[in-house]
């Protein structure tokens, strides 16, 4: 068990924010080498305790949009705010999990997770305790000294989730996190991801998911933005008003899938 004083010392596992939300205002983006606008005038916000999804056809810049939200690349136009303060540079308060399973093969599971704590300047012994706690949270107790090549794709993705959460972010960005997993593993993680990221032992307050899988989106989301067109803009916003856990046997589930699919067909 990690001592409470360690979590508080580095602001790990606790947060003093009353409301944590990410807001973007009229975001647009063009690649520096091209005048083509990828997406234009995207505005929305996430609220506390909410998982928001973004869906759209291939080529509408969804992954690029997450990189802009995380300040890895600057927007061509528009502004980003976290809890009311403008964000212009990368911050550990916003974590991004890429669609490729990004683990460093020469590091153990524990060392992969500890890597994220360098941004918090945590002492080595305390970083180990905090990282072990996060590995426990994602179900990898006993695999601390295993290397990625010794682990399944699902286990490596759990390492990526633990590494994203260990630095105490308040916003988690998920870019197709299950796309490279087999269906059984993906379904297992989908069932766990909502309760995992909003676990009381993490600081996370909201999450944004990009996905092409509409079943996945309806299963996980509180709210969905549909983007379409050239350049991409928001064409629909859908609130998923279903109790959890959600079942595909519920006719309402497929009503939401059909509604999202209709939005994707706009401008074809």
Protein language model regions, located:
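The feature captures the beta-strand-to-loop junction immediately N-terminal to the Walker
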Residues: 55-57
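Conserved ABC ATPase "signature" region
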Residues: 114, 125-143, 192-198
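Conserved ABC transporter NBD signature motif
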Residues: 78-90
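A short, proline-enriched helix->beta-strand linker immediately N-terminal to the Walker B motif
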Residues: 166-170
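Short helical segment in ABC ATPase nucleotide-binding domains corresponding to the A-loop/adjacent helical element
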Residues: 110-118, 128, 239
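Conserved ABC ATPase signature
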Residues: 147-151, 155
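Helix-to-loop junction immediately C-terminal to a conserved catalytic motif
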Residues: 70
């Amino acid at each position: 068990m990690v001592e409470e004083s360690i979590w508080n010392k580095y602001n790990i596992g606790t947060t003093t924010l009353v409301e944590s939300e990410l807001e973007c205002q009229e975001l647009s983006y063009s690649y520096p080498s091209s005048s083509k606008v990828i997406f234009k005038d995207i505005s929305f916000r996430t609220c506390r305790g909410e998982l928001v999804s973004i869906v759209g056809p291939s080529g509408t810049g969804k992954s690029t949009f997450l990189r802009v939200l995380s300040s890895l690349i600057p927007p061509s136009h528009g502004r980003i705010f976290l809890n009311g303060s403008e964000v212009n540079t990368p911050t550990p308060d916003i974590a991004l999990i890429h669609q490729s399973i990004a683990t460093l093969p020469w590091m153990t599971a524990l060392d992969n997770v500890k890597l994220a704590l360098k941004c918090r300047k945590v002492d080595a012994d305390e970083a180990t305790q905090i990282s072990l706690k996060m590995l426990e949270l994602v179900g990898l107790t006993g695999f601390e000294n295993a290397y990625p090549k010794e682990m399944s794709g699902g286990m490596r993705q759990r390492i990526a989730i633990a590494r994203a959460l260990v630095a105490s972010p308040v916003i988690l960005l998920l870019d197709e996190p299950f796309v490279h997993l087999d269906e059984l593993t993906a379904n297992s993680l989908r069932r766990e991801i909502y309760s995992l990221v909003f676990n009381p032992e993490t600081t996370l307050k909201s999450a944004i998911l990009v996905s092409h899988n509409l079943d996945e989106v309806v299963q996980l989301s509180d709210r969905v933005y549909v983007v379409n067109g050239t350049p991409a803009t928001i064409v629909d916003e859908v609130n998923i008003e279903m109790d959890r856990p959600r079942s595909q046997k519920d006719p309402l589930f497929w009503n939401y899938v059909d509604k999202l699919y209709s939005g994707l067909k706009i401008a074809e």
